[in-house]
UniProtKB/Swiss-Prot annotation:
Organism: Homo sapiens (Human)
Protein's name according to its UniProt entry: Protein YAE1 homolog
Location in the cell: Cytoplasm; Nucleus
Any single GO BP term: protein maturation
Main location group: cytoplasm
Underlying gene: YAE1
Keyword Ribonucleoprotein among record annotations: no
């Protein structure tokens, strides 16, 4: 807008003066007052834009974090619910203390994995996009323009890092539907007595319990979907 460009002009030392000076040219006084008002409105517009940008960014960050957390923790919640249902069934129809203790141990194992996942999610920060940040800074005229070649090189480096991160992420996916990058501490060699049992082992033990109790095949189908 033309008035924004005019308001951004820097006044020289000789342009400063009292807007109420009776001996000054009226057109010059009006121009100074107009420039002062426009500069104030530009600053107010920047402040309003920053506040609005913060609100949008916070909401987007919350939505992304909630979606990521829900995707990771959902299967653990379903598994915990299935084990809790089996525990209730055993209390009502079967007083075998061995099975009850085994289910309680599996619930504890799920809790360990959930605790690690939640702790790891809190430490995750989204990667910064160098090109976007530079463009934003240039739009605000807060620094000198960065050469195009340098921006291209930085963008290539950023894409290379993102591709490597995506490759590592894809390699860590588990067949059970749970991202193994969040549950490294849940891997184990001795499943039965490990301090950090894996989700796959918990699912196998739960399916074995379902067969041992002679429950419906639908429960096994439900476990296969986790």
């Amino acid at each position: 807008m033309s008035w924004v460009q005019a308001a951004s002009l820097i006044q020289g030392p000789g342009d400063k003066g009292d807007v109420f000076d009776e001996e000054a040219d009226e057109s010059l006084l009006a121009q100074r007052e107009w420039q002062s008002n426009m500069q104030r409105r530009v600053k107010e517009g920047y402040r309003d834009g920053i506040d609005a940008g913060k609100a949008v960014t916070l909401q987007q960050g919350f939505n992304q974090g909630y979606k990521k957390g829900a995707e990771v923790i959902l299967n653990y919640g379903r598994l915990r619910g299935t084990l809790s249902a089996l525990l209730s069934w055993c209390h009502l129809h079967n007083n075998n203390s061995t099975l009850i203790n085994k289910i309680n141990n599996l619930l504890d194992a799920v809790g360990q994995c959930e605790e690690y996942v939640l702790k790891h999610l809190k430490s995750i920060t989204p990667p910064s996009h160098v090109v976007d940040l530079l463009d934003s800074i240039e739009d605000m005229d807060l620094c000198h323009v960065v050469p195009a070649e340098k921006k291209i090189d930085e963008a290539k480096d950023e894409r290379l890092c993102e591709n490597n991160a995506e490759f590592n992420k894809n390699c860590s996916k588990s067949h059970s539907g749970i991202d193994c990058s969040y549950v490294e501490c849940c891997r184990t060699q001795e499943h039965a007595h490990s301090e950090n049992p894996s989700p796959t082992w918990i699912l196998e033990q739960t399916a074995s319990l379902v067969k041992q109790l002679g429950l419906s095949v639908d429960v096994l189908q439900h476990l296969k979907q986790l």
